[in-house]
C-alpha cells in the first residue's frame, strides 16, 4: 500500500496540473473538476478500461494485482469496496512508475486516462 500512498499524490498533482492548464474558473470549480478525475469511482472506471484494453505491462499488472488484493481497513467515501480496490491498484501503479523514474510511461498512462475523461465530458 506504500506504492498506492505515493501514487495517490502523484495522480492528484497530475490531475490538478491538467485541470489548471486546460480549464478556467474559480478555485472551487477547478476543485470539482479535479474531483471528477481523482475520485475512487472515477479511478476504478479508468482502471477497468485499461484492464479491458490491455494497457498495463506485465510488471504493472503485477503491481496492480498485489495492491488491489492487499488487506486494507480504509474505505473511500462514495465508492464500493471493489471500486476502492481498483483505485488503490491504479494508484499503486502510478507510485511504482514514479519511484522507478519511468516518467514517460507515467505520462503515457495519465494521457490515456485524460482521453477517457474527456470522452465522458
What does each of the following model-derived ranges do?
Residues 1-121:
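Double-stranded RNA-binding/processing signature
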